[in-house]
Amino acid sequence: MNDRLAARLEAEVRGEILRDEPMARHTSLRVGGPADFFVTPADPDDMRALLAILAETGTPWLAVGGGYNLLIRDGGFRGVVISSARMTSLERLEGNRAVVGAGVANGRLTAFLRNEGLAGLEFLCGIPGTVGGALAMNAGAHGGAILDRVEEILTIGTAGFECKGRELLDYGYRYLKLQPGEIIIGATFVLDSDDPRRISERIDGCRAHRTASQQVGFPNAGSFFKNPPGQAAWRLIEDAGLRGARVGGAQVSEVHTNFLVNRGGATAADFLALAARIKDAVKLKSGTALEEEVKIFGDE
């Protein structure tokens, strides 16, 4: 099956196609077994052609951005991992709006908006990864969330391209519901006009906060658990006595207890075992059930 699929991909997809690609190369945790295929479509039309092939052949697939907020199990992913890395359009529109491709890095977007005097997404400067990944999880910080600034998102599926206004989206805290077979390829944002110097000051403040509280020094996926309503996950983990707790090469950060870090040689199984230990300890100590913010895929 893989050889037949490979032949079709090579014949009909213009982007880069890698076989048996270790996902540890494409995730910020630096763990994860091989994907059968790792495909980076050349543009949105190429993405549509790829999705048509996968639908026709019944091939499982997974869309990724910058590989943050993602854990692939050690057995890898049986199917196709799709990267949006080449969806990098970035343009200012009339009316303090900007249209942004899913593959644009969050830091690049905040720098562009600052230079254009457009405010409202400064908090993204401290969130690693891409705009597509940020949209898919409704990323946020410092009281802001990315979908609050969206006018519409552009998605692609087997039926083609679709624009969805924010009022039609089902979203919430670290959550956006997408339809099966649907991938975000871009979004239009509505922003505020402001002096670039004031925007820079806010960006600097966000970066300073991140450096002081989240500069953990080892590969990580950012916050591993969601904050329960009215509570901070890091505090619950701290109170359970787990600062510095370790399973194999995976460790609860000494700097920020909601960050699990790869101290070297970690496996996905190490992170999963450590996460299970944390959930059990927090439940026992506080009665609170933690839920992973990191998305987990793949085979054991």
UniProtKB/Swiss-Prot annotation:
Keywords: Cell cycle, Cell division, Cell shape, Cell wall biogenesis/degradation, Cytoplasm, FAD, Flavoprotein, NADP, Oxidoreductase, Peptidoglycan synthesis. Signal peptide: none annotated. Residues 30-194 form the FAD-binding PCMH-type domain. SUPFAM superfamilies: FAD-binding/transporter-associated domain-like, Uridine diphospho-N-Acetylenolpyruvylglucosamine reductase, MurB, C-terminal domain. The active site is at 174, 223 (proton donor), 293. It comes from the Bacteria. InterPro entries: FAD-bd_PCMH, FAD-bd_PCMH-like_sf, FAD-bd_PCMH_sub1, FAD-bd_PCMH_sub2, MurB, MurB_C, MurB_C_sf, Oxid_FAD_bind_N. Belongs to the MurB family. This is UDP-N-acetylenolpyruvoylglucosamine reductase. It comes from Geobacter sulfurreducens (strain ATCC 51573 / DSM 12127 / PCA). The lineage of its organism: Bacteria, Pseudomonadati, Thermodesulfobacteriota, Desulfuromonadia, Geobacterales. The gene is murB.
